[in-house]
Amino acid sequence: GMDVSRMRENELAQVRNREIGFVFQSFNLLARATARKQVMLPLQYSRNGNRVPPAERRRRAEKALSEVGLADRMEHRPSELSGGQRQRVAIARALVNDPQILMADEPTGNLDSTSGAEIMEILHRLHSEQGMTIVMVTHDQSLADQAERIIHLKDGLIVE
């Protein structure tokens, strides 16, 4: 591990960019950017200030989109995608830097049950096949029950 308590803000930003992927309930996608460009974006800010070359950004973005089942949607903009597909773009964006940890805030909260199940299947696969640590916030007990470990919070404090 690494001691982040003494790091400066720019060092913390680099750690967050390299080691942690973030997935949000509201997707946080850019309206005018294609799925491929959404996923390439984190690579422009990574690797200790050394930008990843454009061809490598493209290759890695395409790989991440393929991993979440969107190889055929790379040129689509968010308005052309379903909610489940938008969340998969967000997951691909979170994965493109090969993080050790994936932080997911209500990743199925804005989705229908079928799309939500597809997202959970992707998260399970990332954990079981790649050994990725996934920290998920949810109010849905049926999703929490799928986790190896559950930590309950109340008013910002651990209660269980």
What is each of the regions a protein language model found here?
Residues G1-L153:
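ABC family nucleotide-binding domain
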Residues D155-E160:
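Conserved switch/coupling elements of ABC/ABC-like ATPase nucleotide-binding domains
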